[in-house]
């Protein structure tokens, strides 16, 4: 029994290691990319949230029940989702099959199927730890985009009276506002949201207005150059055609960037190969453990570590407060006079904090 407990403790301890280069980031330096793993951890009772494959299977099931897909097509898509590796292509073909032959985004039965699968999701939140961790980072300036169709994060945030807002790429004004950091609680759904019949798209051709808009593309790609993207619960995001079109294709010197991806380490050989491959994209792959059960706790602990970082503004406020009841001008002069001493004290404090992390 003791041996089992020690092994478990070692495993848990190993899953709690953090890269110093990541936990010393200010929250406002981060852009969180949320994938299906987050939804799966939050609402484990909904199979459609567990993976892309499960989501597509649930949509096919809904299409069959709603009788919006020919039985022969239902059988063919079930075969594809079982055998095909590129699930994004399967999902794209499924959308096309339930959309007008003209290629227009609406009207489409695909959205009805998504509503069948995802409606009333808020009632199924069972483990909000990951959502709370993400909100804590958003409170401190982190940005969020997602490849998910669901709005679990927004629903959870509204419960806490946060002014959450969902947006997709079809609203240029809001996208620019979000990308420039003026929408603190905005969540960009790059595939659209299940509640929006026009916004659900998997093919970059559906976003021609965006990808051909120089202003929008420059602002979005500038995020990839200047922010540290933190991929949370993402599996195939870098193979996602829309993500590639928005962030990867036109951003040079990706190896000079510093992004992070949290992954499950099921197989060591695969993990270390994936780690080496992702460095070419400027992405550091980090394992949260060898079991998905470690994921929520790892994200919570990681967010806690990052939120400990004091922003430069906070330091200035704290230093001014220490001066007691002096007037504001006197306080400023005092800070300037003792700037070197204050800086030294802060450096020593930072050193102490770093040693304890």
UniProtKB/Swiss-Prot annotation:
Keywords: Acetylation, Membrane, Phosphoprotein, Transmembrane, Transmembrane helix
Main location: membrane
Superkingdom classification of source: Eukaryota
Pfam families reported for this sequence: SIR2_2
Cellular compartments annotated: Membrane
N-acetylmethionine: modified positions: 1
Residues modified to Phosphoserine: 311
Membrane-protein topology: Single-pass membrane protein
Record-level GO cellular component terms: membrane
The keyword Glycosyltransferase appears for this protein: no
GO-annotated molecular function: identical protein binding
Membrane-crossing residue ranges in chain numbering: 30-50
Similarity comment: Belongs to the FAM118 family.
Name of the protein this chain belongs to: Protein FAM118A
Species in which this protein is naturally found: Homo sapiens
Lineage: Eukaryota, Metazoa, Chordata, Craniata, Vertebrata
